[in-house]
UniProtKB/Swiss-Prot annotation:
Keywords: Protease inhibitor, Thiol protease inhibitor. The keyword Zinc does not apply. SUPFAM superfamilies: Cystatin/monellin. Belongs to the cystatin family. Phytocystatin subfamily. This is Cystatin WCPI-3. A motif (Secondary area of contact) lies at residues 35-38. One of its GO terms (molecular function) is cysteine-type endopeptidase inhibitor activity. It comes from the Eukaryota. Inhibitor of papain. InterPro entries: Cystatin_dom (IPR000010), Cystatin_sf (IPR046350). Gene3D superfamilies: 3.10.450.10. The keyword DNA-binding does not apply.
Amino acid sequence: YGNTGGYTPVPDIDDIHVVEIANYAVTEYNKKSGVVAGVNYRFVLK
């Protein structure tokens, strides 16, 4: 099943569960990120 040890594209990025997981990931990432040595980091989902 799938690609062992690799990444595979999400078949439907508009699926409500995918959107919920992505929103959760971004929210958690934003809680842990911030300004470090004057640099802002951004998490991008395409």
